[in-house]
């Protein structure tokens, strides 16, 4: 299991595919108990409703969405 997973998929990836990618990390139990998944994506995409969402940090056109096991 991993403490940190950083995903940097293509910026033009559809939100549905991003949600599937996030879901796979949790379905396959890849994170340690206190682990963190960080997904870099366009600020035009909002992932707050995706399960395991913790917070986001926006930097201009780039957003980092953070997910954990809680």
Predicted regions and their residues:
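Class I S-adenosyl-L-methionine-dependent methyltransferase catalytic core
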Residues: 1-70
């Amino acid at each position: 299991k991993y403490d940190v997973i950083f995903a940097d998929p293509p910026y033009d990836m559809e939100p549905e595919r991003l949600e599937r990618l996030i879901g796979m990390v949790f379905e396959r139990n890849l994170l340690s108990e206190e682990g963190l998944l960080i997904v870099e994506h366009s600020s035009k995409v909002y992932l707050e409703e995706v399960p395991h969402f913790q917070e986001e940090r926006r930097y201009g056109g780039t957003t980092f969405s953070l997910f954990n096991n809680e």
